[in-house]
Curated annotation (Swiss-Prot):
PROSITE patterns per the UniProt record, alphabetical: KINESIN_MOTOR_1, KINESIN_MOTOR_2
Subunit and partners: Heterodimer of KIF3A and KIF3B. KIF3A/KIF3B heterodimer interacts with KIFAP3 forming a heterotrimeric (KIF3A/KIF3B/KIFAP3) complex. Interacts directly with IFT20. Interacts with the SMC3 subunit of the cohesin complex. Interacts with FLCN.
Effect in UniProt of substituting residue 435 to I: Does not affect protein stability nor cilia length
UniProt name for this protein: Kinesin-like protein KIF3B
Organism: Homo sapiens (Human)
One protein family per Pfam: Kinesin
Kinesin motor domain sequence ranges: 9-340
GO molecular function annotation: ATP binding; ATP hydrolysis activity; intraciliary transport particle B binding; microtubule binding; microtubule motor activity; plus-end-directed microtubule motor activity; small GTPase binding
């Protein structure tokens, strides 16, 4: 049975980082004041008047920029980890704006012992506690996951594209299906697991943070402890420590996020808004519904917020005036979270404890190994009874051998048996009185015995190695408890824890004194004169008036914040309505009514996966259809042995299940012929045809030219050169009618 415990509030601490280089260069003012002793954080309005009172918030503990990592761990987180080691569930998560130091608080700086965060310090704490424990067995497992754009990814898996599903069981609550878990035996191993996961985590650069976490990461450590109770039986306690590093809320105008970074920021802000709504609903006593299912982050933190867990919330803020709105929002949510009530209980004897499975498997293997050793002992006794007439000396030797064998001297036993078989083999080979066949038979028997002996030895060694491997995963403390250094370290840690507890009590007492100061002053006030009474009451009136103004300013800020949230919700609603109208328009115009009604009838909402699905059309849709049975001999139909033999002997169609009639192919007559190429190339043939072609005769009509020449000769005067002139005149038309050779044309 689980031990029930009274409800306790979520413990909330605030940590303020120092001003960074960009804020100093831009000359921003420091508007956050931290009072570590009183546990108060005050925020001044950078745009307000000089008389305006700062807004003050009180928490369980506050830490300024001078706080060390180990101080934060010893005072705030060490008691929670101690509770996990006792069997409670515990959660530590950092909340706040991007760039305020959440990852630094949770992980710190690697390689620097003084700047290690909560996660590495918790590793040392857990394994140191295990090494100092007595009469207890521990099993430590580690898992690492991230929520990136509302998708769960296993950071320790080789396949980073695989998306995991959230499931819920009545006995264990919400869990991640198929999440890998690694058994770790030391701080070095669990740090290696964390480093592998950090390499796969989504990180990006924005204007506000160079190494901004773009996903919510959860490192889960499961510690199982087995201890013998008063009833003499083993009882197992299981504690689970969730170390959550949330991505920071951010505004697009400040971070300059675009493209993929803007999509990431949208999903981050949605999940953080869902977390804020869960916190508000848990604090508000009127809420009947807690919206855990609004995001995967709130579903995973369901036990941590109002459930079976002890929770510490670290609110990280920045001191610059540039981020005053985000700082106030973070402090308001953290102030609300103080009022969340959890009901933690010790998880005793769960059904799915891996430690119990390990113990049962080790016990089974040991019983199997013991059974083998009993079989060997019985065989020795039989051999001893068979050779009992050999005298008392031999019996004494065998008893001595048995004592040695029972004293875990197994190697000597195997060696002795092997040497004995070798001697017997040698004796058979050297014995010339035996027939060759008999000798071979005896040698084979001895070889078989040696092989059986070898197999038995290998099986025993394998069982022993398996037992050692499984026992090595179970951590048992008390081995170094006598060590003086270890004892001194233990005393030192106890003193540090006492100092941290004393500081916490002093802080609580001072807070109570501050709240009761006003009541005591009112009761003890006595006035010596009317003027003194007027002065004191005027002073008190001014103080109350300043408080009234601060409350009015707080109400005004809350109203403005409410208006902004309402406007954002209205904008989201309008976008969703517009998208819904578009989908309805497409359905009405492009999808038939019958198909629409079929889809509407099949649609249902899956609450576990948080989205709509379709019922299968038939019951067998998700099952594999059964195939027709196939013949064992390769035929399409099953055939008997007689039918197969008849088919081979006689080519009859009676016993054939396929290819009953064997026909030759009926080839058609040929309708084409082979191509024959020309004897002479086509270009050469064309040139020859052109050269051998007959040319047409050219006929020239010169009658018109002759009549013209005769007329000219009659018109000329007579002279002594008649013949010459006539020859020249007659030669002129001939030169015009017939072309003359120009000789060789130059290239």
């Amino acid at each position: 049975m689980s031990k029930l415990k009274s409800s306790e509030s979520v413990r909330v601490v605030v940590r303020c980082r120092p001003m960074n280089g960009k804020e100093k260069a831009a000359s921003y003012d420091k508007v956050v004041d931290v009072d570590v002793k009183l546990g108060q954080v005050s925020v001044k309005n950078p745009k307000g008047t000089a008389h305006e009172m700062p807004k003050t918030f009180t928490f369980d503990a506050v830490y300024d920029w001078n706080a060390k990592q180990f101080e934060l761990y010893d005072e705030t987180f060490r008691p929670l980890v101690d509770s996990v080691l006792q069997g409670f569930n515990g959660t530590i998560f950092a909340y706040g704006q991007t760039g305020t130091g959440k990852t630094y608080t949770m992980e710190g700086i690697r390689g620097d012992p003084e700047k290690r965060g909560v996660i590495p310090n918790s590793f040392d704490h857990i394994f140191t506690h295990i090494s100092r424990s007595q009469n207890q067995q521990y099993l430590v497992r580690a898992s690492y996951l991230e929520i990136y754009q509302e998708e769960i990814r296993d950071l320790l898996s080789k396949d980073q594209t695989k998306r995991l599903e959230l499931k819920e069981r009545p006995d264990t609550g919400v869990y991640v299906k198929d999440l890998s878990s690694f058994v770790t035996k030391s701080v070095k191993e669990i740090e290696h697991v964390m480093n592998v996961g950090n390499q796969n985590r989504s990180v990006g650069a924005t204007n506000m943070n160079e190494h901004s976490s773009r996903s919510h990461a959860i490192f889960v450590i499961t510690i199982e402890c087995s201890e013998v109770g008063l009833d003499g039986e083993n009882h197992i306690r299981v504690g689970k420590l969730n170390l959550v590093d949330l991505a920071g809320s951010e505004r697009q105008a400040k971070t300059g996020a675009q493209g993929e970074r803007l999509k990431e920021a949208t999903k981050i802000n949605l999940s953080l808004s869902a977390l804020g709504n869960v916190i508000s609903a848990l604090v508000d006593g009127k809420s009947t519904h807690i919206p855990y299912r609004d995001s995967k982050l709130t579903r995973l933190l369901q036990d941590s917020l109002g459930g079976n867990a002890k929770t510490v919330m670290v609110a990280n803020v920045g001191p610059a005036s540039y981020n005053v709105e985000e700082t106030l929002t973070t402090l308001r949510y953290a102030n609300r979270a103080k009022n969340i009530k959890n009901k933690p209980r010790v998880n005793e004897d769960p059904k799915d404890a891996l430690l119990r499975e390990f113990q049962e498997e080790i016990a089974r293997l040991k019983a199997q190994l013991e059974k083998r050793s009993i079989g060997r002992r019985k065989r020795r006794e039989k051999r001893r009874e068979g050779g009992g007439s050999g005298g008392g000396g031999e019996e004494e030797e065998e008893e001595g051998e048995e004592g040695e064998e029972e004293g875990d001297d197994k190697d000597d036993y195997w060696r002795e048996q092997q040497e004995k078989l070798e001697i017997e083999k040698r004796a058979i080979v050297e014995d010339h009185s035996l027939v060759a066949e008999e000798k071979m038979r005896l040698l084979k028997e001895k070889e078989k015995k040696m092989e059986d002996l070898r197999r038995e030895k290998d099986a025993a060694e394998m069982l022993g190695a398996k037992i050692k491997a499984m026992e090595s995963k179970l951590l048992v403390g008390g081995k170094n408890i006598v060590d003086h250094t270890n004892e001194q370290q233990k005393i030192l840690e106890q003193k540090r824890q006492e100092i941290a507890e004393q500081k916490r009590r002093e802080r609580e007492i001072q807070q109570q004194m501050e709240s009761r100061d006003e009541e005591t002053l009112e009761l003890k006030e006595t006035y010596s004169s009317l003027q003194q009474e007027v002065d004191i009451k005027t002073k008190k009136l001014k103080k109350l008036f300043s408080k009234l103004q601060a409350v009015k300013a707080e109400i005004h800020d809350l109203q403005e914040e409410h208006i902004k949230e309402r406007q954002e919700l209205e904008q989201t609603q309008n976008e969703l309505t517009r998208e819904l109208k578009l989908k309805h328009l497409i359905i009405e115009n492009f999808i038939p009514l019958e198909e629409k009604s079929k889809i509407m009838n099949r649609a249902f909402f899956d609450e576990e996966e948080d989205h709509w699905k379709l019922h299968p059309i038939t019951r067998l849709e998700n099952q594999q259809m059964m195939k027709r049975p196939v013949s064992a001999v390769g035929y399409k139909r099953p055939l008997s042995q007689h039918a197969r033999m008849s088919m081979m002997i006689r080519p009859e169609a009676r016993y054939r299940a396929e290819n009953i009639v064997l026909l030759e192919l009926d080839m058609p007559s040929r309708t084409t012929r082979d191509y024959e190429g020309p004897a002479i190339a086509p270009k050469v043939q064309a040139a020859l045809d052109a050269a051998l072609q007959d040319e047409d005769e050219i006929q020239v009509d010169a009658s018109s030219f002759e009549s013209t020449a005769n007329k000219k000769s009659k018109a000329r005067p007579k002279s002594g050169r008649k013949s010459g002139s006539s020859s020249s005149s007659s030669g002129t038309p001939a030169s015009q009618l017939y072309p003359q050779s120009r000789g060789l044309v130059p290239k």
